[in-house]
Amino acid sequence: MCGIIGIIGNDEVAPRLVDALKRLEYRGYDSAGIATLQNGRLDRRRAEGKLVNLEKRLAGEPLPGVIGIGHTRWATHGRPVEHNAHPHITTRLAVVHNGIIENFAELRAMLEAEGRKFETETDTEAVAHLVTRELEKGKSPVEAVRDCLPHLKGAFALAFLFEGDEELLIGARQGPPLAVGYGEGEMFLGSDAIALAPFTDTISYLEDGDWAVLTRNGVSIYDENNKPVERPVQKSQNTNMLVSKGNHRHFMQKEMFEQPEVISHTLANYLDFTTGKVRKEAIGIDFSKVDRLTITACGTAYYAATVAKYWFEQIARLPVDSDIASEFRYREMPLSKDSLAMFVSQSGETADTLASLRYCKAQGLKIASVVNVTGSTIARESDAVFPTLAGPEIGVASTKAFTCQLSAMASLAIAAARARGAIDEVREQELVHQLSEAPRFINQVLKLEDQIAAVCHDLSKVNHVLYLGRGTSFPLAMEGALKLKEISYIHAEGYAAGELKHGPIALIDETMPVIVIAPSDRLYEKTVSNMQEVAARGGRIILITDKKGAESASIDTMATIVLPEVPEFISPLVYALPIQMLAYHTAVLMGTDVDQPRNLAKSVTVE
């Protein structure tokens, strides 16, 4: 969600802050700003909208100084306008914040009763005034922040800059991630390693309750009990090449075309294609002792989890619950200690998913995670971590992270099946071989981009779209609908095809496109029956199938997208591509901001 950067160094800081903020754009934002110290005096520049507006402001009104903080804001409290943008300042400090201060109304009422004037609608301004209040009592900046943190309820990552002190940055974390970066005679704070990549690859992640005091020469970290602690220092894998779109129009398009390569890398991490076996050393879980699996996630990751449910149940004969994290965490679900709790998150910082993990951990369950950021909080709090080797995903709408999540969990399903005796060695080799072929089939689908883009001219003119699928194509239908909603802003819904007669069929008329995901598998004839019901009511069908399915459908369609024939096991990996491309090219035709769609954030670090 919001992005934070803080730098204390020896070079002009404003351009460095803006550079870092550009790397945080993928998180989603609606305004931006920076503050610096020069000769002990605080100054700031803010702008509504994109960073280019802030850059224009800085071109006319430069901000000198070698220490500063910056922020990209995703509005939670207060409208997305300049006066609500961060940093917020008082006569004594500047502060930036990612998260939600749940008791801000109570704090604001108390501070206003003391005569303090609020200029914004944000929860963050209450933090600025609260710390200023302690400074005015004669406390040092370190003492003031330390004494205020226990009074803040909710989720927050904070960075402070203090009037008159060019040797000090303070950061604090409770919920949203915050990393410390180590340089030569300079130090950094950032929401993630990507923001810090131009400056350092040496970082530490603060844990919940930590607060950090940075000078040019190093950092002192304290836990929630104000005891000095050390956090592991690690090398970040992110590099400066990450911000390039290459020859592609958008990051999303680039990331779609990266899928064959990153899926290959992810699969090779778990499977030995030479022997046709699972790499047991990469698994770290004894599935023979697991009697039930709970997979919990949000958004696109939840749809990946739901596909995986089919795999684990059908191949490994392992009962699975797939849950939306924001619901699971409040259900107070009874859990067996012989269950395995698995959590899926691209960022590894998704707030509801992390809270669900901690609930399961408190119940004594073994914790596994499928994450794309191996240094993330979810990864650090897991007993077993299964990385998706997708590389950084900049587009807000997930593409390659989704298919890499599928790849990792497909591999785990084979491992579970073998460990539980549900398949023999020959079947294991068959399934591993099928997965090894997935990147080749995906490359064939990518060559259909122009054909798929042509279908989108009609899609871009409608207001509603229905997606249908059966089996593993049902969660793909939900994912396809989500993609279209996210980036084209067209209302779309994904349904199990067998549910058509239980309500959605009432929506069908000649204005309603219905996208049907229907590989010619054992469920194909059932899906054809549903298509006939749509056609009988004038619905316009876009059929995504293979050659065999296209030849046997005998139904007039608005368009038919013919994919290569693939084994049922890997069809979700292959059929994910056309639903991504349909959403992408529809959004391009509609002129939306594909990589940073309105109101959305890449990493949802608050409830």
From Swiss-Prot:
Major place of residence: cytoplasm
Sorted UniProt keywords: Aminotransferase, Cytoplasm, Glutamine amidotransferase, Repeat, Transferase
Location of the active site: C2 (nucleophile), K602 (for fru-6p isomerization activity)
Sequence ranges assigned to domain Glutamine amidotransferase type-2 in this UniProt record: 2-217
GO molecular function terms attached to this record: carbohydrate derivative binding; glutamine-fructose-6-phosphate transaminase (isomerizing) activity
Reactions performed catalytically: D-fructose 6-phosphate + L-glutamine = D-glucosamine 6-phosphate + L-glutamate
Tagged with keyword Repeat: yes
Pfam families, sorted: GATase_6, SIS
Domain SIS: 283-422, 455-597
GO cellular component, one term: cytosol
EC category: transferase
EC number(s) given by UniProt: 2.6.1.16
Subunit structure: Homodimer.
Reported function: Catalyzes the first step in hexosamine metabolism, converting fructose-6P into glucosamine-6P using glutamine as a nitrogen source.
Protein's recorded name: Glutamine--fructose-6-phosphate aminotransferase [isomerizing]
Species of provenance: Brucella abortus biovar 1 (strain 9-941)
Taxonomic lineage of the native organism: Bacteria, Pseudomonadati, Pseudomonadota, Alphaproteobacteria, Hyphomicrobiales
